[in-house]
From Swiss-Prot:
Pathway: Amino-acid biosynthesis; L-arginine biosynthesis; L-ornithine from N(2)-acetyl-L-ornithine (linear): step 1/1. It comes from Escherichia coli O7:K1 (strain IAI39 / ExPEC). SUPFAM superfamilies: Bacterial exopeptidase dimerisation domain, Zn-dependent exopeptidases. It catalyses: N(2)-acetyl-L-ornithine + H2O = L-ornithine + acetate. Keywords: Amino-acid biosynthesis, Arginine biosynthesis, Cobalt, Cytoplasm, Hydrolase, Metal-binding, Zinc. It is an enzyme of class 3 (hydrolase). Zn(2+) 2 binds at D112, E145, H355. This is Acetylornithine deacetylase. The lineage of its organism: Bacteria, Pseudomonadati, Pseudomonadota, Gammaproteobacteria, Enterobacterales. InterPro entries: AcOrn-deacetyl (IPR010169), ArgE/DapE_CS (IPR001261), Bact_exopeptidase_dim_dom (IPR036264), Peptidase_M20 (IPR002933), Peptidase_M20_dimer (IPR011650), Peptidase_M20A (IPR050072). It is found in: Cytoplasm.
Amino acid sequence: MKNKLPPFIEIYRALIATPSISATEEALDQSNADLITLLADWFKDLGFNVEVQPVPGTRNKFNMLASTGQGAGGLLLAGHTDTVPFDDGRWTRDPFTLTEHDGKLYGLGTADMKGFFAFILDALRDVDVTKLAKPLYILATADEETSMAGARYFAETTALRPDCAIIGEPTSLQPVRAHKGHISNAIRIQGQSGHSSDPARGVNAIELMHDAIGHILQLRDNLKERYHYEAFTVPYPTLNLGHIHGGDASNRICACCELHMDIRPLPGMTLNELNGLLNDALAPVSERWPGRLTVDELHPPIPGYECPPNHQLVEVVEKLLGAKTEVVNYCTEAPFIQTLCPTLVLGPGSINQAHQPDEYLETRFIKPTRELITQVIHHFCWH
């Protein structure tokens, strides 16, 4: 029953108080099961059907899909349940205690992005879900901050095809219709060690990597010349060399060298296309030194994303907000949800607060966010 639902600020407080950290380091990684249980119970109280989906390949993590209404199409509101780890030495407040001060709600996940579910639940108090003409879906995903495994798995397995979706990442209520992707790779070169006094008796992996880097930088220039998307502040795919390590002593021929790099592809560029370009760039080194160069993913790749600018979702949201859609350089789960239906990224709070100590959401977002959620539900599910 709706009268069982706690007040907005108590929902928010309970979400923040329930840890759900995602981390590649196992010691820091946490299950989101308790948070999913909280959300599932609240949506059941509102009359939703709730499905909890274990996410394979994770450490006891789950997605939740709450649904109400009949028929095809409808609206999907989505967000992730996990947060990044916190640096205890840099926080001046308890990350798991919601505190309000000077027009700001502080806590880990207030902006990125547990708070979005509090806004959805609060808005639904005034919605009679039995009268919806089209279905309404609420998706809560796992592991966005690391592998995006939850959104990937949901998109791969669901039969849902809503009319449109909104992901409530912190965009300061500015609608986002496109962003770049992210690919991170490790280039490893295996040489042959030996004493530095006789270089011919070894294969210096650093020297081979020097050759490989030259070809990678040429690829970087080619990407900048061949691909362009004017709406982005950096209107071409970027390629960054972020980390390199090789060798263990000045008098030893380096036996192994490893380079970590990332590429930020534009929307429309496929992951297969980029992998092919990288392999082509490194082919001269591989052909000269067979079996010594390998390329491995550091993290699962994320494609670029774009919602068609003329889609009804864009037109409706721009009209409701009085603001044009934007494009951004950071990544979200949108590429995976976009495979199901046209998707916008739109939510309260600033992206500048994401992953920061003393994370907060300004209280000025409370009223307009609640109104926006109510309006999009009425537009896409009542008509």
